[in-house]
Amino acid sequence: MLRHSLRSASKLQSKNVRLLRAAPLLLKRSLSNDPKEVFTKLTDENDPQRDAFFKYGWGSWLKNDKQEKEKRVTRFSIEGLNKVLSDLHEQSAQADKTAKTDAVPPPSYNPNLTVSLPHNVTSKHLGTPKRGESVRVVSMASFHEGKHHRIYKIDTNAGKSFVLRIPYGIDEENTLAYRVKSEVATMDFADLKLGMNVPKVFCFGVNALNPIRQPFILEEYVPGRLLMKDWMPLASDSADGSHKEKLNSVIQPISEFQAKLAETEFTAFGSLYFAKDYRESNEPAYKSDTDGDLADRWRIGPSVERCFWRKKSALPFEQRKQYLGPWTISQPLDIVKSLGSLEAENARARLAIKQADASPEAEIDEQVLRDQITAFENLAKLAPVMYNLKTKSIPNMDAIVKPRLCHPDLDPMNVILHEENGKPYLLDFEGTTVKPFILHNNPQFVAYDGPKIYDLERDVENYSKLNAQEKDQYEFMYKRTRNQYLWESQLNQNAKHLISSIAPLVKLLRSPYVYAVQRKYDQEYLLIDEALVQLKEVWELFAKNELTNSEQFPVEFTEEWLRQHAEKLNAYHEKLIAEPFSATQGWMPQDLFDNLVKSGVLVKDANGDHSLKQ
């Protein structure tokens, strides 16, 4: 996710500004309250002063810390960045000389293996250096280290700032290339077709063969503050109802983004690409008689939804590709089947590598992989009968199975309020895909699948007689219920024809799929199994109401399997409680890690790994 750091670099003092004029480049890290400043020479590619600027420092892992951090080093060529910026300025100068038309020019595939968007590459957006000067970078700040990429703020002598996004090299080259191509095309679509406030993309590269020597996206820097600063999810209710206004001040703009994204009905399921980046199809991404040059600008290609790419290195890319789509508009549930089949095949490949003693995953349990195969095969079996696509029991069924954009990161941490006009900007589009709206889930910042409490006094027996700790637990459930209700109320207001997608029974039917999409860690396959078990218990009711077109649940569970499943699920939950960092695979923020080491809570072993002191 693209985040603007809450602790941005402090402004330079006057003496540093004078040094800046004398020095070719200033590097700043802003990951602490005391940002460090380092000067480097542009002509010295191997300057050791630069090393810390590229290293990962946002957090640490209890195990394999060195290896995990090495995967996230984002060393790139600063000299190459200057060349890319210079090339963009040359393109803008040429564009200023050519005749102006209303037509939006197609992306420019440049000889240096970058792609630029000419309609954004203008002197207005890029700035103009002083007469006689060539454009160059004068300072860079390490702005944020996210889950999937690093964010740098770039300042130039042309008076403009930019954001440079470098994805971590965790995934292999094909994965990164598809992700970057699709994200830029989706942001372009949101800007040109939907008129949304998003950062303008100037240039991107999909591999390390460009001058920057890394896959990258160079885009507009949007100054402002994060919407997250206004989000108070556990705020208590106020007598005058003002708490709803405060909560809705965050929920409403994000809901409006969702409604805008869902506005267009596409011609297939998958993800957006520029036409030249997906030549396997000649069909436009959507049908239009009025959009002219825009209608043929994009295509629907393979899905870049994270679940289709996460930890799939055990499978060769060509083997994976058959499961990635695009999928025909007449078969909306094939997405679910493909995901189940891909995950099962991936688990088989990992198991084979493990059994051959060739697996880099030392701690993975073979039985866990076998159980995963079964769980995902069961999900694939469920897919064809998951919904009755012709049912009259679900209002507007035709509308909610149409292909619509699904943004996986609708979150106040991904929205910035522009400092000049207060308008919300949606920053990051990584992993955005086109799928049936009935398969979209509520955003994580409001999602809640626990017990629903709408009124504490009415829904909780003897609430007033409970002790303080018990009241706190119920109040937490109430506030989570309240926040989700406010979100769903906004959906009803902004896209009423799609509201049936969040009906409780509709949610329950898609729950195994949602857990598969959101799965990050190996043992979370147990949540898919549990959702299937719960679904089987009420399947007869669904069949009677024609919500599904199969009277028989497609999966059978033996009593022995159910017993073992309950034991494994309980053990997993106990592990989460006993090992506080197991849910993050041993990762923790750097400040916390340093404090725990300093206080002796974390101890280091002979292998360099850390554990909690017993």
From Swiss-Prot:
Its main location: mitochondrion. It is found in: Mitochondrion. InterPro entries: Aminoglycoside_PTrfase, Kinase-like_dom_sf, Mito_inheritance_9. Residues 1-38 form a transit peptide. Residues 110-125 have a biased composition (Polar residues). It holds the Pfam family APH. Signal peptide: none annotated. It comes from the Eukaryota. Disulfide bonds: none annotated. SUPFAM superfamilies: Protein kinase-like (PK-like) (SSF56112). Keywords: Mitochondrion, Transit peptide. Transmembrane segments: none annotated. GO terms for cellular component: mitochondrion. Residues 90-129 are annotated as: Disordered. PANTHER family: ALTERED INHERITANCE OF MITOCHONDRIA PROTEIN 9, MITOCHONDRIAL (PTHR36091:SF1). Belongs to the AIM9 family. This is Altered inheritance of mitochondria protein 9, mitochondrial. It comes from Eremothecium gossypii (strain ATCC 10895 / CBS 109.51 / FGSC 9923 / NRRL Y-1056) (Yeast).
